[in-house]
């Protein structure tokens, strides 16, 4: 059913979308299955195919984040970092992660990013991949050789084209799992070595930094690296994690998101948010978790001007994943968070431009996107309040045919198609249910 609305007076609770005011280009959305790729690979059929279809096709992701695999070079291939001793590398390891990446490719995922959690143990001060430890300065050339071999080898042996490489995941953080700490100055010096190696080997993977655990520390790393022209020339993307923002208070991070956006403008780099998720249990698997998650996505896109957003835990054995998979491999559960993030991931295509969208009501979060190739408009509205809100959407400088399909996620709806609506005189009037996420799109799905 198509609804027609004629609106003559603009009320206080209006939304305005202006196609003439443009911001960042969207590279895409995605996530990671890091550490638990075996869960999906070992899931019994037909469940395995069902989950792979949900994650790599239905959800709409185009970016899959991998862990750069150390075991391809568990011991030094030789003492010459300027020469690949290919016979000493082992590309038969990492089969779970490789299987996941290939299944993603089969379903249309086109972009692969790999982040380094730790270099091989023999390169580090503590001779372990876990805990703390740092990359020994005399091993910078060996690191560059290893990560280059990883990129070249995964393309040759597995057909996985790693287009983005995170030099170090959370260089500011230590844990009992794989980590490696770097000062901003150490990261700067390593980038110079890796960048030169990539040039010599013809590697076109984009270098991503600093992937700190939070935004605040990212600023210092960026300042140090970008103040050195010999390092700055190799940096392609700024990346952050959001763990310094309280999960249940997304707006507390707005000022820091604005700060990182200003750094991106200053240095002319796109921003990717490459990891964030709710890591506790009280809200895990609940609709509350889903509603907080999309508020973080909204803020990162609108205030951080991020070009990509990657969730942590696409799938997990816990309910904190978009899909939880049993360790026994005999069942799975799609959580509300899956449908909530789908409201962004499914409908905002790579290459789209974020355009201006303003809401007077603080309970209505709105963002809008223009696909210049097809002239399609996507509008995502989050009503985070406890009451339904009826409002007008005023469309300015929009040239596409104003017929929108509506999809909604709420406590009882799961990215459900709820009908078409046509703007009359470039104005819509819609009711957004309490605690809901609605996507309006002119694209034919």
Predicted regions and their residues:
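Carbohydrate-binding surface patches
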Residues: 360-402, 435
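Alpha-helical scaffolding within the catalytic cores
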Residues: 13-21, 50-51, 96-99, 149-150, ...
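N-terminal catalytic cores of secreted or lumenal carbohydrate-active enzymes
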Residues: 15-163, 167, 182-188, 192, ...
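Aromatic/acidic polysaccharide-binding cleft in carbohydrate-active enzymes
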Residues: 271-343, 354-359
